[in-house]
């Protein structure tokens, strides 16, 4: 069955394996995960748990900042006897009988050796050209060349008379939801509530990440 938790990417470091091998790892801090709702096949058509992460300030009348929860969010969290949460995500295909509304989801949900998928928002790179954004080749850099870092041809013959949708062109790069699959949990530190994941995960430092059981290898 699927397991999941939300956390913040702290950064990267390295640890030594049992055979002395140096392993690069990403540190993910996963605190304040609470089950806000359970969904079942009988009521909702599928099994899932709704997990909230990071407390939000209580409702405040006329508050314009999104740091404060609104009344619906506060009422929803109150059913779980929890504070309003800033981030709420759903994990499907879980063993709902193993969870209770209001229960804290801790890092020991995972153990060393688990294979996981990690989802995050990639770093934003701003407006970039086709060479950096899509990996296109540049032209000659010699003095007589008139083509250095321009995009590939996007024009069509008179038959089409238009640029096709999906043409690779300059534009905003990064800031996309990215999932890296089949990563390995190296260590779980229950005292500091952190998970060490082998390799790198999407997003900047302090970015939100979702850790869940690998969809390809997790249930084998």
From Swiss-Prot:
Key words of the record: Ribonucleoprotein, Ribosomal protein, RNA-binding, rRNA-binding
InterPro entries: Ribosomal_uL3 (IPR000597), Ribosomal_uL3_bac/org-type (IPR019927), Ribosomal_uL3_CS (IPR019926), Transl_B-barrel_sf (IPR009000)
PROSITE patterns: RIBOSOMAL_L3 (PS00474)
A GO term, aspect molecular function: structural constituent of ribosome
Annotated region (Disordered), positions in chain: 127-155
A GO BP entry: translation
One Pfam family this sequence matches: Ribosomal_L3
GO CC annotation terms, alphabetical: cytosolic large ribosomal subunit
Quaternary structure and interacting proteins, as annotated: Part of the 50S ribosomal subunit. Forms a cluster with proteins L14 and L19.
Functional summary from the UniProt entry: One of the primary rRNA binding proteins, it binds directly near the 3'-end of the 23S rRNA, where it nucleates assembly of the 50S subunit.
Recorded family membership: Belongs to the universal ribosomal protein uL3 family.
Protein name: Large ribosomal subunit protein uL3
